[in-house]
């Protein structure tokens, strides 16, 4: 798949590495194009880097790997996303990581859909710590990625993307279910940072 990743931080770098390793065509986009080019060069594996507009233009799937609060600016820079799959991986949390800033009647994913009404927004990966993106860090364990969207084809595409890098994609229903998935991400952060488990844990839905 042709994937644009907006951002050059922990998630952007981990996703770019893993996705490119699985033979996806990855372009990093940053508000500082030089930073994206430098990261792309460091990763290798055919990853390219540049500005946000150029990266988004080349791709069918655009992953926003930036803080939720930066989404409006980045989407403005991304330009026309009509018909593209837009993946929201964010946890809309406070600066101290301890609480969610959005919830109950909406979610970060729904806000992003409102900002990019012609894109097909998919919520995914918000419950996976960056440290667990490299396959070797998962030590053979199959971790679940909860995937929510109002567009079934987009959901299938992002599920295939997650599966191609060794995750178990779980259909989590419509985009409005992000109201429930984002609190799970926040609970995971509490386990990872405040309850002593470290950033090597991930939630899973278990059937008996
Ligand atoms: N880290 C995790 O384990 C984890 C797990 C699940 C989900 N998430 C979510 O993934 C997203 C990224 O997290 P991260 O840990 O990778 O963050 P990070 O390492 O702090 O990187 C954030 C990136 O966002 C960019 N950015 C910030 N403001 C921007 C703006 N106004 N316009 C364009 N780009 C902007 C930064 O660019 P500059 O370098 O130019 O400042 C940087 O590349 C967040 O929404 C987070 O909630 C993170």
Task: Enumerate the language-model features and the residues they cover.
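Active-site-lining helix/loop region of Rossmann-like oxidoreductase modules
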Residues: 143-208
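NAD(P)+-binding Rossmann beta1-loop-alpha1 motif at the extreme N-terminus of oxidoreductases
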Residues: 1-45
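General beta-strand structural signal in soluble alpha/beta enzymes
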Residues: 49, 120-125, 170-172
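Rossmann-like NAD(P)-binding element
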Residues: 44-96
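Rossmann-fold NAD(P)-binding glycine/threonine-rich loop
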Residues: 90-137
């Amino acid at each position: 798949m042709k994937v644009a990743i907006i951002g050059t931080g922990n998630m952007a770098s981990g996703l770019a590495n893993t996705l490119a390793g699985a033979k996806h065509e990855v372009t990093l986009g940053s508000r500082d194009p030089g930073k994206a080019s430098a990261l792309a060069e460091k990763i290798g594996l055919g990853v390219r880097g540049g500005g946000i507009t150029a990266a988004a233009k080349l791709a069918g799937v655009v992953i926003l790997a930036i803080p939720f609060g930066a989404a409006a600016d980045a989407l403005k820079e991304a330009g026309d996303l009509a018909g593209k799959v837009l993946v929201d991986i964010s946890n809309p949390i406070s600066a101290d990581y301890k609480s969610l800033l959005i919830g109950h009647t909406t979610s970060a994913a729904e806000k992003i859909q409102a900002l990019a009404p012609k894109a097909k927004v998919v919520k995914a990966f918000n419950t996976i710590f960056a440290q667990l993106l490299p396959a070797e860090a998962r030590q053979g364990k199959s971790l679940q990625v909860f995937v929510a969207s109002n567009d079934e084809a987009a959901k299938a595409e992002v599920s295939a993307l997650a599966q191609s890098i060794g995750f178990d994609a779980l259909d989590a229903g419509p985009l409005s279910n992000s109201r429930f998935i984002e609190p799970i991400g926040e609970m995971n952060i509490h386990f990872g940072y405040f309850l002593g488990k470290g950033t090597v844990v991930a939630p899973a839905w278990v059937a008996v």
